[in-house]
C-alpha cells in the first residue's frame, strides 16, 4: 500500500518513544506470491527513520552508532519507490517461476512504454521482445515512438501488421451488423491485438 511506509514509520517511532530508545527494524526484500516486501531495514527514532537501506534492494546496512545524528530523518521519493516495487515484483516473479524472457506489445503510447521500461529494468532489455501490431489506425508517429523507445531501452522488436486480419474481421462483422461505427472499428484493432 502506498501509505504503508508512513504507517510503519509512525508505529516504530511511537514504539521508540515509549521505549526511550532507538529501534532496529529488519524487513525482507522481494516478492512472495502476490506480496512485495520493500526491505527498508534500519534504525528508527521517535521522529522517524534515522538510517535505513534503500527500498527493494537486497543489501546490508553498517551503522556507526557513535556518529549517528538522531535528529536526522531519511526522505524518499514516492514515485521512485513505486517503480522499484514494480521492478522487483516482476523480477522476483520471473525468477521464482523460472521465466527468463518476455514478449509485450508496443503501441507507442504511455502504458506500453511504462510496461516495457519496467520489464527491461527487471529482466534485462535483451530478454524483452517488443511486438508492434499496426493497422490502419496506427499512426506513423505511434510506430516511430514505439521503435524509438525500444532502441533507447536496447530491446529487440518485431513488427507484425494486423491490417489483413482487421479488414477481414470488419467485413465479416459488417455482413451481419451493417456499417460499423468508427469507434467500433478502432476498438476492433485493440481486440485483434489481444488474440
What is the role of each PLM region?
Residues 51, 58-85:
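Catalytic P-loop NTP-binding/switch module of NTPases
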Residues 1-57:
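CN hydrolase (nitrilase-like) catalytic-core segments centered on the catalytic cysteine
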Residues 100-106, 110-147:
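ATP-dependent adenylation/pyrophosphate-handling site
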Residues 78-103:
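Phosphate/ATP-binding catalytic cores across multiple sugar-kinase/actin-like superfamilies
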Residues 91-100, 121, 125-128, 171, ...:
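Conserved helix-loop functional segments at active or binding sites
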Residues 2-6, 34-39, 113-118, 132, ...:
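Short acidic, glycine/serine/threonine-rich loops at helix termini
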Residues 57-64, 127-132, 136, 140-184, ...:
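A conserved beta-strand->alpha-helix junction
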Amino acid at each position: 500500500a502506498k501509505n504503508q511506509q508512513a504507517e510503519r514509520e509512525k508505529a516504530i517511532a511511537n514504539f521508540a518513544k515509549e521505549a526511550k530508545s532507538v529501534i532496529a527494524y529488519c524487513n525482507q526484500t522481494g516478492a512472495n506470491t502476490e506480496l512485495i516486501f520493500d526491505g527498508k531495514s534500519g534504525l528508527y527514532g521517535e521522529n522517524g527513520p534515522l538510517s535505513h537501506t534503500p527500498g527493494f534492494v537486497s543489501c546490508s546496512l553498517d551503522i556507526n552508532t557513535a556518529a549517528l545524528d538522531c535528529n536526522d530523518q531519511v526522505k524518499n521519493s514516492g514515485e521512485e519507490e513505486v517503480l522499484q516495487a514494480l521492478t522487483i515484483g516482476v523480477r522476483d516473479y520471473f525468477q521464482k517461476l523460472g521465466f527468463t524472457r518476455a514478449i509485450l506489445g508496443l503501441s507507442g503510447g504511455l502504458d506500453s512504454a511504462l510496461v516495457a521500461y519496467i520489464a527491461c529494468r527487471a529482466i534485462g532489455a535483451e530478454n524483452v521482445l517488443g511486438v508492434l501490431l499496426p493497422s490502419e489506425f496506427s499512426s506513423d508517429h505511434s510506430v516511430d515512438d514505439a521503435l524509438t523507445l525500444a532502441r533507447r531501452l536496447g530491446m529487440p522488436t518485431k513488427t507484425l501488421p494486423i491490417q489483413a486480419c482487421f479488414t477481414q474481421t470488419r467485413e465479416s462483422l459488417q455482413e451481419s451488423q451493417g456499417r460499423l461505427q468508427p469507434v467500433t472499428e478502432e476498438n476492433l484493432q485493440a481486440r485483434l491485438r489481444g488474440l
